[in-house]
Structure formats: C-alpha cells, structure tokens
From Swiss-Prot:
GO molecular function: phosphoribosylanthranilate isomerase activity
Catalysed reaction equations from the record: N-(5-phospho-beta-D-ribosyl)anthranilate = 1-(2-carboxyphenylamino)-1-deoxy-D-ribulose 5-phosphate
Pfam family, one: PRAI
EC number: 5.3.1.24
Gene Ontology terms describing biological process: L-tryptophan biosynthetic process
Name listed for the protein in its UniProt record: N-(5'-phosphoribosyl)anthranilate isomerase
Keywords from the named record: Amino-acid biosynthesis, Aromatic amino acid biosynthesis, Isomerase, Tryptophan biosynthesis
Designated gene of the protein: trpF
Family classification: Belongs to the TrpF family.
Pathway named in the protein's UniProt entry: Amino-acid biosynthesis; L-tryptophan biosynthesis; L-tryptophan from chorismate: step 3/5
Originating organism: Xylella fastidiosa (strain Temecula1 / ATCC 700964)
Amino acid sequence: MNIPPYRTRIKFCGMTRVGDVRLASELGVDAVGLIFASGSSRLLTVSAACAIRRTVAPMVDVVALFQNNSADEIHTVVRTVRPTLLQFHGKEEDAFCRTFNVPYLKAIPMAGAEAKRICTRTLYLKYPNAAGFIFDSHLKGGTGQTFDWSRLPIDLHHPFLLAGGITPENVFDAIAATVPWGVDVSSGIELQPGIKDGDKMRQFVEEVRRADGRRLLGVP
C-alpha cells in the first residue's frame, strides 16, 4: 500500500512571469515549473528562465520541463538555469533522462487506450532511476483535461504527482480520491496560457490545505 504523505506537495507549472513566481513562493508552493518544450504556449527562452530563476525563494524547487529536446538543449538549461529537478514529457528513456545528473520526473499519459496497459511493474522496469512520476491526461501537459483517476497504478511506492485538468474547484476531490504525493497545476490557475491568476493561485493552495487537514483529522 502507498503510505499517505503528511501533506500534499504543490507544483505550479508553466510559469512565465517573475511576479507569479514570487506569489507562488509567498503562498508556500513547493515547486515551480519552467517549460522548454518546443511548441508550448508557455515556452521560455533560457535568458527569461534565468531571470525567473533568480527570484525563486529558498527551498522552492525549480523544475525544467522538456519534451523530446536534444541533449545539448537540456545541458544548456541545466548549466545556466540550474533546475533542481528535470521533467520529461516525451519519448525519453531512462538512460537518457539520467545523463544530466539531475533527479528527474517522468510524465505518464493517462488518457486513451495506452493508459490501460500501464502498471506499476512496467513503470519501474522502464524508468528505474526516476525520482517520481507525473500522471497527466496527455504527454503534452497543460491541456486542462482530466482523466479517470481510477486508472492510476496501484501499489506505487515512488512519489507521484497528479496532473491533468486540476483546478481550485476539483483539487480537494482529487486529493481525497488519489492521495498523491503532490498535485501539478498549470491551466487551472491561469487567465490565459502562461499568465497566472493570483486569486486562483491562492484558492488552489487553500483547497489543498483543506484537503490535507480533513484527511489528517480522519474525516472521510
């Protein structure tokens, strides 16, 4: 069985503005995600990412997100932006992901027929060195679409983040249903792609804390 975390970690992804990152830090968010995947509406240049990196508060993880990027591109980001975690959303294999000597998370798509074949053993065999997994509706991420949470692999002893259509309105139920290590949100706290909404950010954090408090009190 999974051991429930004492509290649910929070990752705000697709950050593009310094002010949004500062507010995330003030709200006690555990990690901020910076996207380097080509074609993303939240894509950052390395120079923009460095400017954001300088404003991140201590003890907040910086997660660099990639999707089928070249090794050279990733090495450049690792060297200049100095992320504390890497996140891979493409066809990257374990050997590639661990080349960069930074802990990594692997995104697993959960929508469609492909998700029916996902099991814990398969994940461990394919990504034995992953620090954790992110279960999202689609590989691309940031789609705002949910998936059937009952499809999550059972007996997963690695930390996992729940993503895909998570919002301030449904994150309480999502935590109650899946008891994740963390939740990962992007479009659910936005006014438009890359532009976060301060009120939604606050509400999201409040709902996560409410869910944690209810669980710790043993309230079903």
